[in-house]
Amino acid sequence: MGFTADQEALVNSSWESFKQNLPGYSVFFYTTILEKAPAAKGMFSFLKDSAGVQDSPQLQAHAEKVFGMVRDSAVQLRATGEVVLGDATLGSIHIQKGVVDPHFVVVKEALLKTIKEAVGDKWSEELSTSWEVAYDGLASAIKKAMS
């Protein structure tokens, strides 16, 4: 069974909830990543020289890009059943930063935790699954571009 219209709608509506507090959820997202993988701090240019996760335009822009790409992946999965990267350099950037498979798991967990925080009592298993499938599609496309 492919990605459904309901799943796409769930991702889109929760994406809007995320964007309503982009500064707060961006900090939450990167704080969650660094709690699970402190060594990943150096992979992010906007974090590597800071004492901790602090709000900045670069942090917000990167978080919005990550979550936006997952949202776009949901749209692509619904329309075509596959994710095609809009930025051909994503594979080489991830290689350059030293990204390996476990990092994708950490980011996925942080993404889900952030969306759960953003939607509050609207969180459901179906919402979680929708984001997981969309993220997995994006991660797969990035990994393919890395090989």
Swiss-Prot record:
Gene3D superfamilies: Globins (1.10.490.10)
Top-level lineage group: Eukaryota
Compartments reported by the entry: Cytoplasm, Cytosol; Nucleus
Protein name: Leghemoglobin
Main localization category: cytoplasm
PANTHER family in alphabetical order: LEGHEMOGLOBIN-RELATED, NON-SYMBIOTIC HEMOGLOBIN 2
Family membership: Belongs to the plant globin family.
InterPro entries, A to Z: Globin, Globin-like_sf, Globin/Proto, Leghaemoglobin-like, Leghaemoglobin_Fe_BS
Entry's transmembrane regions: none
Source organism: Medicago sativa
Residue sites binding O2 per the record: H62
Assigned GO CC terms: cytosol; nucleus
Matching SUPFAM superfamilies: Globin-like (SSF46458)
Residue numbers bearing the Phosphoserine modification: S45
Modification after translation, per record: Nitrated in effective nodules and particularly in hypoxic conditions; this mechanism may play a protective role in the symbiosis by buffering toxic peroxynitrite NO(2)(-). Nitration level decrease during nodule senescence. Phosphorylation at Ser-45 disrupts the molecular environment of its porphyrin ring oxygen binding pocket, thus leading to a reduced oxygen consumption and to the delivery of oxygen O(2) to symbiosomes.
Tissue specificity comment: Root nodules.
